[in-house]
Amino acid sequence: MSHASIIASSEFFSAASPAVIDAIAASAQEKSLVRGDVLFKEGDAPDALYIVLSGRIAIAIDNKPLDSRESVVALMVEGNLFGDLALLDGGARSALARALEPSTVLRIPYSAVEPQLSNTPDLLCGITRVLARRLRAMDEALADSVFLDVTGRTAKRLLELSEGKDEFVLPVTQEELAGMVGA
């Protein structure tokens, strides 16, 4: 699949014209990662967004300096886009992104996207949908942390990870699952 078709299939760029997609794709580069590789850390200066081509990427917030635990706030799989928040507000990275297994991502420099935001207001529609979905997910996670105990949060997350199947292979380690549910 070409970089342009990968970018076009992302809801983030759903309102972009083929010409805009091609302009963005011209600057995109694939990056291979091994388990444990960190794409960026919380506080880093941002310069790109990413689309997962293969593997899994954890988006996590750590609890330092209190202890070495981290909370996995999102699990990015094939087709997911991440690293976009700083594109919109210019702030530093708000979390870290780490490969959970051998992975490949498509790196899209902000410098390729920013001019398109000014020239293509429709592009903001797809971005707004993505951000609204993430905000709803964070609202739900906050409610879960308040109203469900660890057992309830674990059961709910396992149901989500099963994708409705009766039998499935758990795609995360016990430690990663604990980070996802705040245990």
Regions found by a protein language model. Give the residues of each.
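Cyclic nucleotide-binding regulatory module and flanking cytosolic helices
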Residues: 1-35, 86-88, 119
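Short loop/turn microsegments at loop-to-beta-strand junctions
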Residues: 28, 46-48, 168
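Glycine- and acidic-residue-biased ligand/ion/polar-headgroup-sensing regions
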Residues: 36, 47-62, 78-79
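Short phosphate-coordinating micro-motif centered on Lys-Gly-acidic
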Residues: 39-44
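Short, solvent-exposed loop/turn segments that connect beta-strands within catalytic domains
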Residues: 64-70
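Cyclic-nucleotide recognition modules
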Residues: 72-132, 136
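Polybasic "coupling" helices that flank or enter modular domains
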Residues: 100, 118-183
